[in-house]
Curated annotation (Swiss-Prot):
Originating species: Crateva tapia
Official protein name in the record: Bark lectin isoform 1
Taxonomic placement: Eukaryota, Viridiplantae, Streptophyta, Embryophyta, Tracheophyta
Signal peptide: none
Subunit structure: Dimer.
Record keywords: Disulfide bond, Glycoprotein, Hemagglutinin, Lectin, Protease inhibitor, Serine protease inhibitor, Toxin
Length: 165
């Protein structure tokens, strides 16, 4: 069970390379604000930055499947003035919608859900807080093969690992 308010890493079910907002990556020369993409780290065993899941029903202690929730990057280090809450925004550079930070707590546009996907899970984005929702998958861009999260027809199978400490 995933507990409300507890930090977890989101990891692809087939890899140990996790995710991090661009503004926290050490190889970034300057912050990527305001469009701070959630990108996959290039090195296996780099598990990324943990997140906290907050269900729409704040009285729940366990995050339920297929219910609205906010995803909040859990890091004391932050270089952008925008919030740490995940949302989906349009990007002309990346030609479409991307998962980014700068969302608003408990508001339309910042709702995601965790759903079963075979033996794993998947994230879906529900912009209106209800259907239709769209699977969150991986998009690859550039010659370096930078991988970032975006609404896609093919979901990314993920698992969750509780952050220690």
């Amino acid at each position: 069970a995933i507990l409300t308010g507890v930090p977890y890493y989101i990891l692809p079910s087939t890899s140990r390379a996790g995710f991090s907002p661009d503004n926290l990556r050490k190889n970034t020369s300057q912050p990527s604000c305001p469009l701070d993409l959630i990108t996959q780290l290039r090195f296996p065993r780099r598990i990324g930055v943990p997140v906290i899941f907050t269900p729409q029903n704040s009285s729940l202690k366990v995050v339920p499947l297929s219910h609205n929730l906010n995803i909040h990057t859990c890091s004391d280090l932050w270089f952008c003035p925008e919030s740490k809450i995940w949302t989906v925004k349009s990007s002309s550079i990346h030609r479409g919608l991307v998962v980014t930070t700068g969302g608003t707590f408990r508001s339309l546009g910042s709702w995601f859900r965790i759903e079963r996907h075979g033996d794993s899970y998947k994230l879906v984005h529900c912009p209106r807080g209800s259907t239709p929702c769209r699977d969150v998958g991986i998009e690859t861009v550039g010659g370096g093969g930078r991988r970032y999260l975006a609404p896609r027809d093919r979901p990314l199978a993920v698992r969750f690992t509780r952050a220690s400490g």
